[in-house]
Amino acid sequence: MAFPAPAFSLANLLNGSYGVDTPEEVERVRSEQREEAAAACRNYRPLPAVDVSESVPEDAHSLRTPDGAPSEEVSVEFVTYGAEDYLEKSDDELLVAFETMVKPMRIGQLWCPAFNKCSFISSIAMARALLLAPRTSHRTMKCFEDLVAAIYTKSDFYYDDECEADDVQIDISSRDVPGYSFEPWSRTSGFEPPPICEACDMIMYQCPCFDFNALKKSCAERTFADDYVIEGLDGVVDNATLLSNLGPFLVPVKCQYEKCPTPTVANPPSLNRATDRVDINLVQSICDSTLPTHSNYDDSFHQVFVESADYSIDLDHVRLRQSDLIAKIPDSGHMIPVLNTGSGHKRVGTTKEVLTAIKKRNADVPELGDSVNLSRLSKAVAERFFISYINGNSLASSNFVNVVSNFHDYMEKWKSSGLSYDDLPDLHAENLQFYDHMIKSDVKPVVSDTLNIDRPVPATITYHKKGITSQFSPLFTALFERFQRCLRERIILPVGKISSLEMAGFDVKNKHCLEIDLSKFDKSQGEFHLMIQEHILNGLGCPAPITKWWCDFHRFSYIRDRRAGVGMPISFQRRTGDAFTYFGNTIVTMAEFAWCYDTDQFEKLLFSGDDSLGFSVLPPVGDPSKFTTLFNMEAKVMEPAVPYICSKFLLSDEFGNTFSVPDPLREVQRLGTKKIPYSDNDEFLFAHFMSFVDRLKFLDRMTQSCIDQLSLFFELKYRKSGAEAALMLGAFKKYTANFQSYKELYYSDRRQCELINSFSCVELRIERSSSTKQRKKKDGIERRRDDKRRTPTGSYGGGEEAETKVSQAESTGTRSQKSQREGAFKSQAVPLPTILSSRWFGTDRDVPPCEHGGIVRV
C-alpha cells in the first residue's frame, strides 16, 4: 500500500518529514507532473459564452479569440493568476503584487494600509467575481488593479462621474477577465510538488545553493516582545495632560510590563567556594604589583600647580568672562582611604581646569571621513539598521505609550529639588541652542600604567536644565522602550527593566568575540550622524515635527560654564547630558556596526552607548576601516578579544548560563576612592558599602571554573598575572561580608579632634583684668564689642575683670577643624585651680584670658 507523500509546509520542512532523497523518486515526481499536465490538455473544453446586454470591444486586454482558444501567450508580469495560484505564491511575490495593485503609502518602515495575505487574496477573488457579474449600475467600474485596491481599502468600486481615468476604462462583463483564464484545474492528490532550484535543477533544500540552517534560524528567531506582554493599563488624568509642549501625541496611560513566567526547573545546587583569609596588606601588595605607577601617586596639590603655573592653550571662538566667577564652597571633608590605588581627589571647576577639559573633550574635532552624499547614504544606513536589528511585525504591532506616565515619574523624582508643574517653561519661548556646561568632579580611574607621566583630564557634561529635560526625557524613554521590544532576540541592550547582561542558555566559551573601541566618540559625530538618527527616529515612530525640532537645535549650539566664566560654540557633536545621550549613542553605534559588519554572522550582539560586543562561531568578517573613512571615528579592534563590555567580564557557569562580573581591577581602585564625604554616623560610607555589595553579588556564583575563566580573560586583556584576579576575589569576599570589615578601608582625622575636645562642657568662662582694653588701644589693636571671635591668649596686666561665655555649639559647629584643634590645645594649657563665676553689671564680653589670675570654669 502506497502512502501519500507528505505535503510541503514549513512544519514538515523543519521536522524533516518532507523531502525527496533519491534520484528515482525525483524522476517519479516529475513524470507524475507531466502526466497531469497532459491529462489537463486532453480534457480541455471551452466554456459556453455568456449572453450579456453590453458588448465588449476587442482590445489588447482580451485574452482569447471568439472561438475560445488561446490566441497568444499571456503576460505574467503583474496579475495573471487566479486566486488559487496566488495561494501558491511566496510572500515576496505577494508583496510585489500588493505594491503594484494596492499602492500602499510608506511611513517610515510601516505601510498604510498594512499588508495582510488573507485579505489581499480575498480581494483578488472578489474583484474577479465582480467583473464577471452582470452590470446593475450605469457608473463605470474600476479596472481590475484599482478594483482590488478599492476592495482591500473598503472604498468605492466605481470611478467618480466628474473624474476621468488616465487610461481608457473597459467595461468588462464577460468571462474574459484580464489576468484570469477559465481552465479546469483540480488536484488529483494531496501531494504538493517540491520547488526546483533554477540554478542546478535539483530539488530545493538539497542543492548547495540553499542554506537550510539560515532559514531555520530566521524562522525561529524571537524578539523581546514575545517574552514581555502588557499586563495592565492605569489611567493618569490630571493637569499634566494639558501640557502641549510635546504635541497632541501624549497618551494618558501607563503601560506595565512583566516578563512571562519561565518554566519551572530544578534549582542548581549551591556551588559556594571558601576563599582564603586576606588582610589589607595583601590587598595593597596586589595593587603594587598590578598597578606599579599607582601606588605612589598623590595628586593633592596637582590642581594647585596648574592654577599657579603659566598656562598656554590654543582654542577658537572662546569667550572668557572673569568678572562674576562663583566662589568654591568648602565641603566638610572626606574619608581618607587606607589603600593607595591611584585614585584622585575631586576636581574643582576653575577656569584653567575647564579650558583643559574643553580642549580634550569638545575642541579639536577630528576630520577623518571622506566626502560622501549625506542624504543618500544616511537613508541607506538607516535602512540597513532596520533590516539588521528590527523585527518589522513587532514594530508595526507595538504601541507607543507611557509618555505621560514617564513624565509624572520624572516630576516625582525631582520634586525634592524644587521642580514643579507650575515652573515648567514654554519650549517655544526658550532658546534650546544654549547648553550649560560643567566638568565631572570625579575622574574615571586609569587602568594603564601612565600615572607617572600623564595627568587624567576630567570629563565634561553638556546639559539642559531640568525644566527642559523633563519635557523631552519622557518621550525618548517611551521610544527607547518600544525600540527594545522590537529588537531581534540576539540583540541585547543591557539597560532598562527587560534586558540585562544575564543570558540564560548561552555559553561564551568556544566563541569568537569582536569588540570595537571607539575613541573620541562624542565630538567625532557630525551632520552625517545626525541625519542617520533623524531617519531612525522617524522609522521608530517618533513624531516627525519633534524629530526635526530636536535635530535643528543640535546642528549649532553654544555651551557656557557659569562657574568658570567660559563659553564656546559647538556643532553637531553629542551633548553628553541631554535626554537623548544614551539612546543616541546606542543607535549610532548600532548603525555603524551594521554597515561595517554583516550582523547575521553573529549569534549574540550587545550594544550599550559606544560599547559593542559580538559573539560568533566563525571568525567575524567585515571592514572596520569604514568606521574611520566613512563615520569619522577613531576605531580600534581589540586583540585579543575577550567577552568584555561596560567594564564587566562575561563568564559562563557549568549550567550553560552567562552572567556578568565587574572588572576586578577597577573594583580594587574604587576601594581607594577619596570621594566619600565625612559624616558623624557613617551614612555616606554605608551607602558606598551597599553599592559595593550590589556590584559584587556575583561572588556566590563563582565556581573554580568561573575563576579560571576570569583569570584567563584578565590576563589576555591587561597582560598582567591572572592569579592576581583570583586574589582580588578573596578580598572582595571579605569586605562584602559586613560593614565593620569595610570600615577598615577608611579613616578620618576628625575622630582625633573629637577625642581631644571630649572634655568640653556647656560653657567656658575666662576672667581678665580691665587694663587690657587700654593696652589694646596702645598697641593699635581695636575690636568691636559684638565680635564673637576668640582672641588668642597673651600677657596682660591686672585691673577690672570681665567674663566671656562661649557656647559649645559655637565652638563645635561654626569653626573649622583647625581652629577647633588649636582652641582645644590652648584651653587645655590654661590652669584650673578653682571654679569661680562672676558677673560684671550682668553683661558678657568676649575677652582674652590673662596670664596671671586667669580662672577657667569647665
UniProtKB/Swiss-Prot annotation:
CDD domains associated with the record: Bromoviridae_RdRp (cd23252)
Q: Which residues form a coiled coil?
A: none
Renumbered to this chain, region (Disordered) spans 772-830
Keywords of the record: Nucleotide-binding, Nucleotidyltransferase, RNA-directed RNA polymerase, Transferase, Viral RNA replication
Pfam families membership: RdRP_2 (PF00978)
Give the Basic and acidic residues compositional bias ranges: 779-790
For molecular function, the Gene Ontology terms on record are: nucleotide binding; RNA binding; RNA-directed RNA polymerase activity
A Gene Ontology biological process noted in the UniProt record is: DNA-templated transcription
Where are the compositionally biased (Polar residues) regions?
805-817
Please list the residue ranges annotated as the RdRp catalytic domain.
511-624
* Similarity annotation: Belongs to the ssRNA positive-strand viruses RNA-directed RNA polymerase family.
How would you summarize the oligomeric state and partners of this protein? Interacts with replication protein 1a.
Q: What does this protein do?
A: RNA-dependent RNA polymerase which replicates the viral genome composed of 3 RNA segments, RNA1, RNA2 and RNA3.
Protein name according to UniProt: RNA-directed RNA polymerase 2a
